[in-house]
C-alpha cells in the first residue's frame, strides 16, 4: 500500500522539509509514503473559482485512478491517535492506495472536498502549510507505530 501526500504549494522552509524527510524514511517498505507537491495557481486578478479549478486539475493529475482520496479540511472529522491508527489499518486492509490532500492558501474547491472519500482535520487551529506536512506525516507514522506495536507511541 502507498500513502500519497498531495500538497498544493511547492516551497517549504528547509526545517519543514528536513522534518518531513525524517519521518518519511521511518516507514516500513510495505507502507510507502510519497509526497507530490502541486503548483499553487498564481492569484493575479483571477476569481476564486478559477484558482480552485486550476488547482483541482493539478491535484487530480497527481492522483492515480483507483486511489482513495482523503482531504484535510477544517470541517472534516476530528480523529484521535487511536482512531487514525484504526483508519490506517482499515485502509491497509482495503488494499487501495490512499491520497491525503492538503489544499493551498485558499483551501480546496468545495466540490472536490465533497467528492472525496473522506474528510479529516488535524486540528481546530489554522496551521501553516509547511507545518501541516510535518504534522500529517508524523501522525501517520504514529498511527503506524500504534498498529505495529512499535514503542514510538506511548499511552
UniProtKB/Swiss-Prot annotation:
Instruction: Tell me which GO cellular component terms the UniProt record holds.
Output: cytoplasm
Q: From the UniProt record, which GO molecular function terms apply?
A: rRNA (pseudouridine-N3-)-methyltransferase activity
Q: Which domain of life is it from?
A: Bacteria
Keyword Transferase on this protein? yes
In short, the EC number is 2.1.1.177
Binding residues for S-adenosyl-L-methionine, per the UniProt record?
72, 103, 122-127
- What Pfam families has UniProt attached to this entry? SPOUT_MTase
List the subcellular locations. Answer: Cytoplasm
Query: CDD domains attached here?
Result: RlmH-like
- Catalyses which reaction(s): pseudouridine(1915) in 23S rRNA + S-adenosyl-L-methionine = N(3)-methylpseudouridine(1915) in 23S rRNA + S-adenosyl-L-homocysteine + H(+)
> Which Gene3D superfamilies does the annotation name?
3.40.1280.10
Chief localization: cytoplasm
Q: Which InterPro entries match?
A: Alpha/beta_knot_MTases, RlmH-like, tRNA_m1G_MTases_N
- Enumerate the UniProt keywords alphabetically: Cytoplasm, Methyltransferase, rRNA processing, S-adenosyl-L-methionine, Transferase
Q: Which family does it belong to?
A: Belongs to the RNA methyltransferase RlmH family.
Outline the subunit composition: Homodimer.
Chain's role: Specifically methylates the pseudouridine at position 1915 (m3Psi1915) in 23S rRNA.
For this entry, the protein name equals Ribosomal RNA large subunit methyltransferase H
Organismal lineage: Bacteria, Pseudomonadati, Pseudomonadota, Betaproteobacteria, Burkholderiales
Its gene is rlmH
